[in-house]
Amino acid sequence: MVGTTTLNTGASLELVGYGTWQAAPGEVGQGVKVAIETGYRHLDLAKVYSNQPEVGAAIKEAGVKREDLFITSKLWNNSHRPEQVEPALDDTLKELGLEYLDLYLIHWPVAFPPEGDITQNLFPKANDKEVKLDLEVSLVDTWKAMVKLLDTGKVKAIGVSNFDAKMVDAIIEATGVTPSVNQIERHPLLLQPELIAHHKAKNIHITAYSPLGNNTVGAPLLVQHPEIKRIAEKNGCTPAQVLIAWAIVGGHSVIPKSVTPSRIGENFKQVSLSQEDVDAVSKLGEGSGRRRYNIPCTYSPKWDINVFGEEDEKSCKNAVKIK
């Protein structure tokens, strides 16, 4: 039985969800069907993953009651201007064939200008190497428009993703509305204890993405780390199961992605770690072990904006416009 948590709206959320990032069209639909058959009821989607129509068809085929699913999607960067927010939500609902989302997040604290067909032109280019940024619209502007969605019946809860404490404080101060969730990169190499303590005090739930680390930067995989493998062997489980069990300690949720049926099942199976094992996993991210994998200014094309204050972002010309 998968553990659950209660959001600040009173809604119940399963701690292990099914992620659809980097799941290729043609594979993701089958993955979603297998996930629902396995027992997953928390699905994490986004406009920019470019696979929502297929996910929507798979949800329909799976034949589970809508109210038994918890479905999250995300507002993309080119729809941050207040007048674009509801149309972007409508586009996502249309792609999914749904009447409402359980949770809608601002995907990044970064805005792109709405150019051309904004349902398709997701990365307007400044030039061959860079994405064009919209430095006029603020996070507060976008959050105010998100708050208005709550009255439409099209979303049950709203939240953010990739926001730091300062950004979260600013949107709460401006509107009096606290995000239900902040979805952040979190794994044993990126512990973020200050952000976690801040969110706990404000009753903001944390969902961890990239819980198994990330294989896009050519770094050694976390699932192959000797310490993770040792703990897996000791507990008679897989390294991925160790990382997922570690991630949900403290009541956080996690959204591992796989399109392989056996792995989808493995990721859903609950493993309990001793405190000693939890501490051993956490030690990996202390000191020089720390690593953030998802930094927009390292993307190609580059987003020339400092989001997290990481070393790699110091040369960025632009900062996040908070208010």
Swiss-Prot record:
Protein name: Aldehyde reductase 1
E.C. no: 1.1.1.2
Broad class of enzyme this protein falls into: oxidoreductase
SUPFAM superfamilies reported for this sequence: NAD(P)-linked oxidoreductase
Organism for this UniProt entry: Sporidiobolus salmonicolor (Yeast-like fungus)
Positions with a binding annotation for NADP(+): 210-267
Described function: Catalyzes the asymmetric reduction of aliphatic and aromatic aldehydes and ketones to an R-enantiomer. Reduces ethyl 4-chloro-3-oxobutanoate to ethyl (R)-4-chloro-3-hydroxybutanoate.
CDD domains: AKR_AKR3B1-3
Binding site for substrate: H107
PROSITE patterns: ALDOKETO_REDUCTASE_1, ALDOKETO_REDUCTASE_2
Reaction(s) the record says it catalyses: a primary alcohol + NADP(+) = an aldehyde + NADPH + H(+)
NADP is among the record's keywords: yes
GO molecular function: alcohol dehydrogenase (NADP+) activity
Catalytic-site annotation from UniProt: Y49
Lineage of producing organism: Eukaryota, Fungi, Dikarya, Basidiomycota, Pucciniomycotina
Gene name in the database record: ARI
Site, as annotated: Lowers pKa of active site Tyr: K74
Record-stated family: Belongs to the aldo/keto reductase family.
